């Protein structure tokens, strides 16, 4: 079941239906959005138009859906709008057309702190840790909106990332790229999100560390978190994802299961050969 937690619903009843989701007021006034299982997506970007500068669009009608418990892979050539898509979903790039919904709620152009409250986590590609803070302090920063659950969530993260527990007092600035990626993922998971957005989690890592990152992503997904992952390592991404999308010039040009896309002659000819040369 998908869930997203945040503040109380102003003026709302304790329980009401939004499309396929039931919204309940949980403990400590948290907003709990529970998926009711009728086949609707937990996250949907529909006809998305977005860009950084006025009058210049990077996304030109992009469509992506993630259903509860899915791992979605987003691939495509450089400049296709992959990272922009995640940033637009997370409120970091202005959306000028289309919509983004989370469990039936319109979250288009919502601020990042509100999206964290609602159950969306985001791990950027760069500058994704606080280098002068320890590992544990980095994780604490991920739960600043709900500090009462700190001990519980730290225990959960150290179970999922044992190495972080062993080195919790070490400053993040001294970690390797793969270790920093683990810290960034764990911090995003501290709020127990229903959806996790990953922007090129294997970028800059050795092949061994890339494999570890993909396995860890699958493990996170197996806990019930829906994952939307942008990746330049296209072939590896398609091997582990449930469904995938190919972005080109700001639009979704192809979609299907990971295996379908990996075996699609057009995708192989137009994208996989080029992308394989980049990784």
What are these regions (language model features)?
Residues 26-279:
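Glycine-rich phosphate-binding loops of nucleotide-dependent enzymes
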Residues 6-7, 11-12, 26-29:
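Residue-identity detector for glycine
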